[in-house]
Amino acid sequence: MRTVAVVLAAGSGQRFGGAVPKQLRTLAGRTLIEHSVAAFESAPGIDGILVVTTPGLAGQVRALVLNGRYRKVTGVIDGGVTRTDSTRRAIAALGADECDVLFHDAARPLIDQQTIAGCIRALATDLAVGVTVPSSDTIVEARDGVLTGMPRRDLLLRCQTPQGFRLSVISRAHQLAEADPGFTTSASTDDCGVVLRYLPEVAVRAVPGSERNMKITYPSDLDLAEALLRG
């Protein structure tokens, strides 16, 4: 079965700030989008790459990834207002043919081959997978500034991307979410959350990630990513 990577690069980057959109900021001479695309281009188990970008930036992004350097890129499409909208547009663009699909945030440019391969292997036996790392910090629950609970740390993992699914599974989960008037107020902020909420019978397998697979949220994160690339 084919495996397609969807690089989600349609975020607004409000916390990052600056005149240049975050996904077009450079890290070690390449934009954040290119780092993610290059990682999936190099992955033997990836058959195609679809890039979802901010409306108005598609021309710039096409110039970066449809220049012959990345042969697996099949298209660049406009995303939506929210991450959920962007995911749904990607699902529609992938069509009806069954495949495995990995959704990856372009804001995580240091994704490695071991993690990608782990997702692909897991999808050989599972219908949904999510990359996770253990939490080294104690996580607490709070309401109105008052601590209300302290979940067991050994039961907590931090989510990263990629998140992978059989296409028909993630498509069905989003169909159910779209039909639910209460979805926009739910805690399902990513695709694994949508599956957990609307297809509880589908097990979501945890795939070990890496602390290097950090998310670029603030300008200072670029400095840390540069240091990690230098080793």
Task: Show where each model-derived region lies.
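Conserved alpha/beta core of the MobA/IspD/sugar-nucleotide pyrophosphorylase nucleotidyltransferase superfamily
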Residues: R158-G231
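Conserved beta-loop-beta/alpha segment of the NTase-like Rossmann-fold superfamily
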Residues: G75, G80-R143, L155, C159-T161, ...
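Conserved N-terminal catalytic core of the sugar/cofactor nucleotidyltransferase
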Residues: E34-E98, D180-P181
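N-terminal glycine-rich phosphate-binding loop and ensuing alpha1 helix
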Residues: M1-A58
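A residue-level structural signature of the nucleotidyltransferase/glycosyltransferase Rossmann-like core
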Residues: L50, R108, A128-G130, T148, ...
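Hydrophobic packing residues within well-ordered alpha-helices of enzyme cores
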Residues: F16, V61-R62, C119, I139, ...
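Short beta-strand segments
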Residues: V6-A10, V51-V52, H104, V131-P134, ...
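Residues at the starts of beta-strands that form the adenosine-phosphate
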Residues: D47-I49, D100, L127-A128, A203
